[in-house]
């Protein structure tokens, strides 16, 4: 029989082994926690978060203001967790410049939400396409042809027709009745953008497209738990995916009709080589039919690009015109200077247009000041594809990168009395002379900067101030209660005014110039 000692020896050995394993496990856990803690310390500063939802409970609309308030406490580069999505927020020109100048290649992607993916035809367009040869081809096509200076100039008559239609409508309104300028500007902007995209479509298609553009903006701008909370992914708890699928089906049918009308018109004009008659759809179809093109455009590419242009260009232009009119009406001295400049340059016998803009520096300064205070896209949105080291912090791959353009435009480090509407700051001696909104000056980038900067910037810089010039030249506008216009912001992808702009319009020009 074995002795007790003999029996205890293996048990003692087992205990020693288990103890060693336990000690090793403790060491592994401690090291893991320490490494994670070290990693967290290397992330930008962050407020306290909650399980599952992260910092979602801290966000109040409009989000750019919430980010601005958090940055005042945490600094110009901070980390937030929106559910299971990690994000960094840049709130100063210096941080934005470092991100774009030093790390552009690593933040050239744009995150695609569940709803946006449907309208983007799975990244077939331009706005959400991954950085790739296809994206680079579309970028060149945009900047050189689709939205380049030549095309913008050739399509000026389309925009002028939309403006004339708006002026006619306002002129026909009884002076005792208020004009819903918000509604009319959206209608004008939508119609102009759709006509620039496809000039041959009948009015019934244009009207349906206007309705769908509005719904798309609402769906894409809505908070969707599927995008942020991993537990909700794939369940479509809010029904946004189902609604988006239905709207996408309708929009796809409409786009097919637009393309069919265009193809029929092109068949009738096979011998027409007049480049000046081409709209955006013509240019896209030309590229699709070009066997020597660097990238072969598919029908989905064409439809996705048209949706990109129509949805991005409509509401933003209307919102900027409305903000600029509201700011000038709330600042009578600036309004007086704009009108005096227009009368000195244009006179009272014709209506101001885009061709007058180079000789209207105060009007353009007022537009820049509006862009500084009220950028239509207050947050530039990117996504990292690789880890970034910036200012001693680590930004992991697959992190959403937000640049708070709205906050940067109000930074007192760059702008004297930053909350004041003062167009003079962009004129000689004003401190901002030579500062342009084209993305090279990081303290002022209402159209973004770098590879993902807004391709429609040139169009916006032409169309918006021209519409404002005509509205202010032709009419005296009066608030219904003779008070200052409310400047509260709505929540959504586009930073628009929250309440409709209802104004009485009184013609200023007698006789009224011909509307041509």
Curated annotation (Swiss-Prot):
Its membrane topology: Single-pass membrane protein
Pathway where it operates: Secondary metabolite biosynthesis; flavonoid biosynthesis
Gene Ontology MF term list: heme binding; iron ion binding; oxidoreductase activity, acting on paired donors, with incorporation or reduction of molecular oxygen, NAD(P)H as one donor, and incorporation of one atom of oxygen; oxidoreductase activity, acting on paired donors, with oxidation of a pair of donors resulting in the reduction of molecular oxygen to two molecules of water
Localisation per UniProt entry: Membrane
The keyword Oxidoreductase is annotated on this UniProt entry: yes
Keywords, in A-Z order: Flavonoid biosynthesis, Heme, Iron, Membrane, Metal-binding, Monooxygenase, Oxidoreductase, Transmembrane, Transmembrane helix
Source organism, top-level taxon: Eukaryota
Residues where heme binds: 454
Entry GO CC: membrane
Transmembrane segments: 11-31
Any one Gene Ontology BP term: flavone biosynthetic process
Annotated catalysed reactions: a flavanone + reduced [NADPH--hemoprotein reductase] + O2 = a flavone + oxidized [NADPH--hemoprotein reductase] + 2 H2O + H(+)
Pfam families tied to this protein: p450 (PF00067)
Chief location category: membrane
Coiled coil (UniProt feature): none
Enzyme Commission numbers on file: 1.14.19.76
Disruption phenotype: Slight reduction in plant height. In cell wall, altered content and composition of lignins derived from typical monolignols.
Database matches in InterPro entries: Cyt_P450, Cyt_P450_CS, Cyt_P450_E_grp-I, Cyt_P450_sf
Cofactor: heme
Disulfide partners: none
PANTHER family in the record: 3,9-DIHYDROXYPTEROCARPAN 6A-MONOOXYGENASE, CYTOCHROME P450 98A9
Physiological role: Functions as a flavone synthase II (FNSII) that catalyzes the direct conversion of flavanones to flavones. In vitro, can convert naringenin and eriodictyol to apigenin and luteolin, respectively. Acts as a key branch point enzyme that channels flavanones to the biosynthesis of soluble tricin O-linked conjugates.
Sequence similarity: Belongs to the cytochrome P450 family.
Protein name as annotated: Cytochrome P450 93G1
Organism annotation: Oryza sativa subsp. japonica
Name of the coding gene: CYP93G1
């Amino acid at each position: 029989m074995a002795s007790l000692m003999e029996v205890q020896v293996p048990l003692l050995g087992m205990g020693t082994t288990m103890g060693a394993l336990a000690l090793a496990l403790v060491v592994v856990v401690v090291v893991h926690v320490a490494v994670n803690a070290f990693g967290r310390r290397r992330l930008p500063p962050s407020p306290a978060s909650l399980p599952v939802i992260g910092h979602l409970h801290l966000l109040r609309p409009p989000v750019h203001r919430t980010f601005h308030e958090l940055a005042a406490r945490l600094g110009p580069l901070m980390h937030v967790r929106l559910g299971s999505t990690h994000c960094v927020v840049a709130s100063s020109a210096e941080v934005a410049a470092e991100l774009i100048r030093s790390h552009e290649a690593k933040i050239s992607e744009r995150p695609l939400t569940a709803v946006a993916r449907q309208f983007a035809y799975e990244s077939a367009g331009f706005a959400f396409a991954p950085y790739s040869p296809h994206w680079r081809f579309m970028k060149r096509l945009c900047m050189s042809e689709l939205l380049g200076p030549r095309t913008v100039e050739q399509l000026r008559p389309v925009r002028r027709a939309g403006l004339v239609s708006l002026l006619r409508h306002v002129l026909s309104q009884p002076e005792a009745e208020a004009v819903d300028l918000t509604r009319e500007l959206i209608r004008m902007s939508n119609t102009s953008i759709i006509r620039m995209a496809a000039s041959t479509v009948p009015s019934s298609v244009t009207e349906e497209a206007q309705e769908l553009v509005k719904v798309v903006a609402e769906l894409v701008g809505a908070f969707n738990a599927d995008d942020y909370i991993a537990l909700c992914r794939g369940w479509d708890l809010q029904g946004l995916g189902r609604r988006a699928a239905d709207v996408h089906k309708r929009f796809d049918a409409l786009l097919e009709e637009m393309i069919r009308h265009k193809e029929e018109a092109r068949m009738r004009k096979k011998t027409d080589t007049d480049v000046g008659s081409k709209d955006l759809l013509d240019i896209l179809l030309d590229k699709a039919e070009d066997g020597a093109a660097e990238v072969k455009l598919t029908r989905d590419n064409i439809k996705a690009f048209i949706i990109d242009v129509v949805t991005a260009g409509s509401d933003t232009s209307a919102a900027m015109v409305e903000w600029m009119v509201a700011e000038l009406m709330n600042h009578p001295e600036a309004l007086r200077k704009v009108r005096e400049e227009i009368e000195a340059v244009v006179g009272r016998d014709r209506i101001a247009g885009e061709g007058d803009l180079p000789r209207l520096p105060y009007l353009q300064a007022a537009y820049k000041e509006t862009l500084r205070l009220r950028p239509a896209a207050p947050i530039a949105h990117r996504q990292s594809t690789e880890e970034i080291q910036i200012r001693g912090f680590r930004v992991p791959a697959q992190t959403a990168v937000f640049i708070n353009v709205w906050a940067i435009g109000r930074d007192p480090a760059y702008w004297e009395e930053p909350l004041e509407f003062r167009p003079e700051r962009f004129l000689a001696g004003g401190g901002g002379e030579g500062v342009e909104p084209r993305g090279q000056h990081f303290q002022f980038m209402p159209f973004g900067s770098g590879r993902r900067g807004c391709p429609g910037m040139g169009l916006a810089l032409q169309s918006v101030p021209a519409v404002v010039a005509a509205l202010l030249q032709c009419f005296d506008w009066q608030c219904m209660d003779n008070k200052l216009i409310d400047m509260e912001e709505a929540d959504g992808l586009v930073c628009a005014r929250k309440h409709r702009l209802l104004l009485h319009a009184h013609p200023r020009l007698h006789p009224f110039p011909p509307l041509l």
